[in-house]
Amino acid sequence: MEIELKPINEQDIDFLYGLLKEREGIVNISHKELPPFSEHEQFVKSSPYPYWDIILLNNERIGNIYLTDRDELGIFISKDFQNQGIGSIVLQKFMKKVGKKRYLANVNPTNYKSIQFFGKHGFTHIQNTYHKKID
């Protein structure tokens, strides 16, 4: 099993949108609903994260991992490849590549798999954040 991380590029836009579709309806923190493709494409092209990689397993794209400029970490692996230890390997490779001393993971409080995953890797619960949008 060969796991690699490669920086995203414009050829990954469709794949990344597919991951968003796969996550739709799953407890996640970044999207309440699927954005239009054009909005997604513009977002990816804007290079919003200092580190954003595609996860490759034996040269097949299976997920992505990113780090924001505020050290917030996000990872998603396609359902077919979850619960195989890949996320643990990816997290270690990514943190070694990035080399930061601190990482934050924003996790929906009902996403028990993610809470367990990050806890297993030494992340500790520090706060619950609440959001209010005013139209």
State the predicted function of each range.
Residues M1-Q11, D135:
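Conserved N-terminal entry element of GNAT/NAT acetyltransferase domains
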Residues E4, E72-G74, L104-N106, H131:
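Short aromatic/hydrophobic contact patches that present stacked aromatics
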Residues L16-K21, H40, V44:
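Hydrophobic alpha-helical core bundles mediating ligand binding, dimerization, or RNAP-core interactions
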Residues E33-D80:
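Acetyl-CoA-dependent GNAT
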Residues N83-K97, Y112-K120:
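Conserved acetyl-CoA-binding loop-helix of GNAT-fold acetyltransferases
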Residues V98-T110:
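Conserved GNAT acetyl-CoA-binding A-motif
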